[in-house]
Amino acid sequence: MLLSYNADLLPRVRMLGRINYTEPWIHFSRTIDEYVLYVIRDGNMYLQEDGIFYHLKAGDFFLLEPGLCHEGYQRAACNYYYAHFTHPEMARMKDEDAAMALLAEKRRLSLVSYNLDEADPTDSITYLPKQFHLPGSEFNTILRTALDCYNAREEHYKRRTAALLHSFFLEVAHEHLLARGAAQGKKLKKSEVVAERLLHYLNENYTRPL
């Protein structure tokens, strides 16, 4: 399941934190009007949302959606980050394959783009997975930085926290695209990137003497 996400717009963060339940715990039932992000550091979380059951493990990224009832269905110890936020242009996608094909094309266009051009090589829409296993532990660094910023409550702390969360989302979208491409055996060869960049350069500079 994918959610479209306009990368030109920051999320509005209401709350961000980290909880460590060392004793088995079960999530309470609720329906809220905002997105909730969970990133599991250690342990397990058992959730059902809108009748679908999920088992989250260490390293998992998960997004709860507004307006859908969610609750736990099994007790477990769990250490996790959470963020409650809204976003003006974020919605569930119907055609996931088409969305990922579009994102793969955006990656190709970005790789062959000239980075001094004023215009961005693609539009601002990316796609976030609802559930994804993060490939490394680096996510801890950016989430810990965001949490420190949020807890410090210095000037513009929510905007700075939102910017960090936004960066994290873009990284997750990128890693999900790479993981999906690897699973499907698709990879843009370096030679193709070089050829595309050379073609772009020639098109831009064909009137100049070489």
Describe these PLM feature segments.
Residues 62-64, 82-86, 169:
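Short beta-strand segments
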Residues 140-147:
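Short, Lys/Arg-enriched alpha-helical recognition elements, typified by the DNA-recognition helix
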Residues 86-94, 175-180:
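Short regulatory "switch" loops immediately downstream of catalytic or recognition motifs
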Residues 21, 42, 88, 151, ...:
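Residue-level marker of positions within ordered structural domains that often coincide
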Residues 124-137, 150-208:
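Short, Lys/Arg-enriched, Trp-marked, Pro/Gly-tolerant hinge/linker segments that flank
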Residues 1-77, 91, 95-131:
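Generic protein-terminus/edge-of-domain signal
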